[in-house]
Amino acid sequence: MLNNQDFIHTLNPQQQKAVLHTKGPLLLLAGAGTGKTKVLTSRIANIVHQNLASPQNILAVTFTNKAAKEMAERVNSLINCYGLNIGTFHSMAARILRDQIEHLNLGLNNRFTIISHDDQLKLVKDIVKLKDIDTKKYAPKLIHIIISRWKDQGLLPSKLSASDTNLPLQRVAKLVYEEYQKNLLISNVLDFGDLLLYNNELFIKNPEILRYYQEKYRYILIDEYQDTNVVQYLWARMLASLYKNICCVGDDDQSIYGWRGAEVGNILRFEKDFAGATIIKLEQNYRSTLPILAAASNVINNNKNRHGKTLWTDRESGEKIKIISCWSDKEEARYIAGEIDKLVREDRYNAGNIAILVRAGFQTRSFEEAFINSAMPYKIIGGLRFYERMEIRDVLAYIRISLNQNDNLALERIINVPKRAIGAASLNKIRVYALERNISNFAAIKEMLEMGEIKAKPYETLKDLVTKIDNWHERFSIDAPINVVKAILDDSGYLEMLQEEKTEEAFGRIENINEMLRAIAEFNDIHDFIEHSSLVMENEVLETNYGGSVTIMTLHAAKGLEFDVVFLPGWEEGVFPSQRSLDEEGEKGLEEERRIAYVGITRAKKDLYITHAESRKIFYEIVRSYPSRFITEIPDEITIRTSSMKKYNSFYKF
């Protein structure tokens, strides 16, 4: 355990300045690889060490559970600091709502559950169908995106202005949004957007509750501030408005999530929001070589809307940036696969320390083929995460309906899994009955069974299901969660259904369920597990053992990671910068594309390759390509520019 002077002396001068600033608003502009996590954790340790606040009065907010866990571990390695409030925006908001939900007078209780993205979309689809909305004109997925964006902006249906509903699609979305919120409240469930949205409503309508949390959280630290949306920004600003001891850490040059609601303006206007704010820049980079940093700085300097900063390093040496022209995207993939094979065979780098970062998903196919042909192990980062897999979501739905019998979405997911001969007509009859009486579908089934409204085979299967759900509900209050979930798997017939399939896929699903049971066994309270799984689904970053495999992933997914060698393919106009971004967002879109380029360049520690093709196959058509403008922004003196075609030139001399 270090004492105060020990951990302060491990910091560079700018880092020390940030750690020792303990009063008033602070914006910490932390460039890529400049040690921001070290500064954040040292700052928390210093606040506690100086007795400026107890750990319970410090709130640190991150965007992922992984980042929150890492921050807590690193703080505790510096100083005994138990009781800190470290978590994601959603987890902290959920905690506050569980304590204060009754003050919103929405009919919710503190046992509300948090529904997943898929369940949100299903509810939207159900409402669209019920309202007889033309899905060809008004796609449910698009309606759901609009509703989510409104929530990110802090807008409930009642707060939507005329300008928010100018277009026919927006007017339809508002109609669905109103019904969507009613359904959530009836079911005693919330979606992720509601957590902060209702937090802010709680604070606005109950000043005394806001004051309580302002007193509780006297020091606030927010990581990745450039990625915050409007509702997150408003939440943080309200909490910090009393003591103003807020430290926001971020890099406007790495704001690349505008497409999902992030507002780079939040970090750019920090000084206006918090009068007298101090701004400290972390510019000494500990990750990359000088040529890599020079390339990144020269590219990003072309953006106008940014806080000026220049990364530097005391490491003078470094490989020049390789910029390679290839005649096609297939040749580009073959060249990169061959170069990686050479780097690995010559023992210059391990395959696990090499990454290919693409701008768009369609670029990956040619690399898969090239690596298969060269027998190079590779890993494409993507696919379904654990808690998004079908069988896991099914079991979660069984648990949710057992805990909260008003959860319509959970009931509808499992009512015919395994098959119970409950047809669409019976389901619709239940929905209509419930809506007319403003009750949940489960309550409707119970009443309809008692009144003889359900006949023939559905009567027996529904009666059996209701009896079992009631039994599981009771058992959860007296038995260990793991025992009840095992009973659910057996009694429902779900496990038997998978076992009878006798396919590799079914066996894989059973293995996943067993893994889920191992996770449940770690929780004494099933509600804690449900909340944990919901928050993990929203924030989880795919964990991959890079081992000896080359990593292929998108530039967006690579943010926060680093590799010895990085290949950046497809640097062509229309591909990168994306033509769609330019067409839809103009100059704003171009600046975000340039920030994505900056993120890609700064992932490299030692070696960086940028490639572009003379022609590219896009949607089955071969298109002539031109080098990206971002390539022209990199100075010639730090690059080696070659063509993968030079080795073939001798064959065409006459």
From Swiss-Prot:
Cellular component annotations (GO), alphabetically ordered: cytosol; DNA helicase complex
Protein name: Probable DNA helicase II homolog
Taxonomic source organism: Rickettsia felis (strain ATCC VR-1525 / URRWXCal2) (Rickettsia azadi)
GO biological process: DNA replication; recombinational repair
First-level EC class: isomerase
Catalytic activity: Couples ATP hydrolysis with the unwinding of duplex DNA by translocating in the 3'-5' direction; ATP + H2O = ADP + phosphate + H(+)
Function (record text): Has both ATPase and helicase activities. Unwinds DNA duplexes with 3' to 5' polarity with respect to the bound strand and initiates unwinding most effectively when a single-stranded region is present. Involved in the post-incision events of nucleotide excision repair and methyl-directed mismatch repair.
EC numbers, comma separated: 5.6.2.4
SUPFAM superfamilies per record: P-loop containing nucleoside triphosphate hydrolases
